[in-house]
Amino acid sequence: MLKRDQVSEYLKKLEQNERKILRDLGVKFGRYHVFLYQLIKPEAVSLRTLLWKNFYQKFHNLKPPTFGLNFLDDKEIKNKNFMLLCGFERFDNFFVRIDILERLFVLIINSSSKENSEIKLVPEMLNLLGCSKDNFKKLLQKMNYKIFEKENET
């Protein structure tokens, strides 16, 4: 898993046929990350975290989040590199699974109106993350979106 902004120069130089080859191999070019979806699966995460702990010879008390969770609100997690290794992106105390974050971005794009840049909060967004409406609003703010109430809507 790579943060897209860390490899943006490399990605700009990739030809479309090279991108197609990578896509055919399972590489996902998301808004925020470039990743292999197969590496977010539980078995791959377990193996990667085991190897990571053995390589660094510390952090043995760190455990990956429960598989199946898409959203975490945890102020105790300090090691963002470990969480990224587990497939989660950090937004202060919120963690969102990378593939879910990309799907959320698609929902946001699809819910925005053409005449302005407003997005409407739809239940599918909350269901995708599995978080409360309040936490979702806070997450959007941490992702640099502006939140405002509009006649009982968000």
What are these regions (language model features)?
Residues 1-121, 128-133, 138, 143-152:
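Acidic, serine/threonine- and proline-rich low-complexity intrinsically disordered segments
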